[in-house]
Design a protein with these regions (language model features):
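Divalent metal-coordination and catalytic microenvironments
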Residues: 49, 160, 255, 302, ...
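Hydrophobic alpha-helix feature that most strongly marks membrane-spanning transmembrane helices
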Residues: 87, 120, 152, 252, ...
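Short loop/turn motifs at secondary-structure junctions and domain boundaries
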Residues: 240-241, 344, 388-391
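Acidic, glycine-enriched loop/beta-strand segments at the rims
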Residues: 273-281, 287, 332-336, 344-378
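Ligand-binding pocket scaffold of soluble enzyme catalytic domains
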Residues: 353, 398, 429
């Protein structure tokens, strides 16, 4: 193991384990006996070292056949009962992927009250990610007000705030919104070199443009799935920092169809260019306000999910390069605290986050004048040659984990000093 990791126990996992019948976990409420068994499993996981309980209520989390994941069909009473186990143990954190309450203020408030009461009644910290959206720019502030409201009632709640837009990256090296259309599907089966040759054929290119603009029956994309592009918000990521031009702007400038422009831009870069589609956090003033809130923590990641679609590992280097060095919106000291002590404190790890005798020796050695994310790259090093996105950084000379130099100037030193960091109940044994 290279880095220090932790684990939570998920509601989906405990449901599937206890109900045994996979289909029942996705369609039926547990019986009284099954609910008691789920609570036993949750306590067992906490005593084995889990740092908390996680669950999902968001429509973005579906099975491959488009059905809700098991936790989405659970009642809120089931969630309360399971979180109550953590309250009884006086340990652990509750992480939740939020319900979509829509734009109805009453529905939003009803959900926020449930979240608040969950934190207050259980006595356990509740956390979730929050973003702004160009489609609903007023959705996020009430959730930040909720943090203060919960604290005033004796509960603990914090929001995980991203440091930039949350983007889906698409490219000829990975996936495009048109891949499922027959003429595109035939092209995309070929090697990158053969795709490039095909795209230079004006006859084939015309067919591709026509196909992409056709009236296709398409289901609404969820999460990081490909969807029909919004060209006014589809940007050419030809550099890390930008500014990035939109495909719509380039199409108007060149007097061509947006799909034609995407093909042209890709050919100009030998097909090695990303188009980024922001899903959330388009307004960077909103991003900064969320980061600065005293009850937010600057962190967010889908971890092992969407590895060929989303690249969030540059969240921290973006804080240091963009918000500190380029914008001057944060001091270096503020930013370092946001990225180290505040997450450690929020998740209850009081042995790390500071450089102090007796604390965990996890350090990043960087040059404030040079630290920055590099361009994402595509690698095919997962099992069966599956692809993933990788993003490295400039200006970091060393990464120290548990007192050992793990990375030096961007290269792995060959040591594996990471460990599974267990929660307080396991540590107390």
């Amino acid at each position: 193991m290279t880095v220090t990791e932790t684990a939570t126990i998920s509601e989906k996992l405990s449901q599937s384990q206890i109900l045994r019948d996979y289909e029942r976990a996705f369609s039926e409420a547990p019986t009284g006996d099954e609910m008691r068994a789920m609570k036993v499993e949750l306590e067992s996981a906490m005593r084995a070292g889990a740092i908390g309980f996680s669950t999902s209520r968001t429509r973005n989390h579906q099975t491959p056949d488009g059905q809700p994941v098991a936790s989405r069909v659970a009642t809120w009473d089931e969630v309360r009962e399971l979180v109550g186990v953590l309250g009884d143990l006086d340990a652990g954190i509750v992480e939740i992927a939020n319900e979509e309450a829509g734009r109805d203020p009453q529905a939003q408030r009803e959900y926020q009250v449930r979240l608040r009461d969950l934190a207050v009644e259980s006595g356990r910290p509740v956390t979730f990610g929050m973003f702004s959206s160009r489609r609903a720019p007023d959705i996020w502030p009430p959730y930040f007000d909720l943090l203060d409201e919960t604290a005033a009632m004796g509960g603990r709640m914090f929001i995980q705030a991203h440091s930039r837009a949350l983007n889906v990256l698409m490219s000829f090296e990975t996936r495009l919104p048109f891949d499922k259309f027959p003429v595109w599907k035939e092209l995309r089966k070929k090697s990158l070199a053969d795709q490039e040759a095909g795209l230079r054929d004006p006859v084939l290119r015309a067919r591709l443009v026509e196909s992409a603009n056709g009236n296709h029956e398409e289901k609404q994309g969820v999460g990081a799935e490909m969807r029909r592009p919004d060209y006014d918000w589809l940007l050419v990521m030809d550099s890390v920092a930008g500014p990035h031009r939109t495909v719509a702007d380039l199409a108007r400038e060149r007097g061509k169809d947006p799909v034609e422009v995407m093909i042209e831009v890709a050919l100009e870069h030998k097909l090695k260019v990303f188009f980024r589609q922001p899903l959330f956090n388009e307004d960077q003033d909103h991003v900064l306000a969320m980061m600065r809130h005293p009850r937010s923590v600057v962190t967010f990641s889908d971890s092992g999910a969407h590895v060929s679609q989303i690249m969030d590992s540059s969240l921290q280097t973006h804080v240091l390069s963009h918000w500190v060095r380029e914008k001057g919106a944060l001091s270096l000291e503020e930013a370092v605290r946001m990225l180290t002590l505040e997450p450690a404190t929020a998740w209850g790890f009081d042995d790390r986050g500071l450089i102090r005798v007796g604390m965990a020796a996890d350090l990043i050695v960087f040059d404030p004048a040079k630290v920055a994310p590099l361009m994402p790259e595509v690698r095919h090093d997962l099992p069966a040659g599956a692809r993933r996105l990788v993003q490295k950084a400039a200006g970091i000379s060393a990464t120290v984990v548990n007192g050992q130099v793990l990375m030096r100037n961007g290269e792995h030193t060959g040591v594996y000093p990471g460990q599974l960091l267990r929660g307080p109940l396991a540590a107390a044994r």
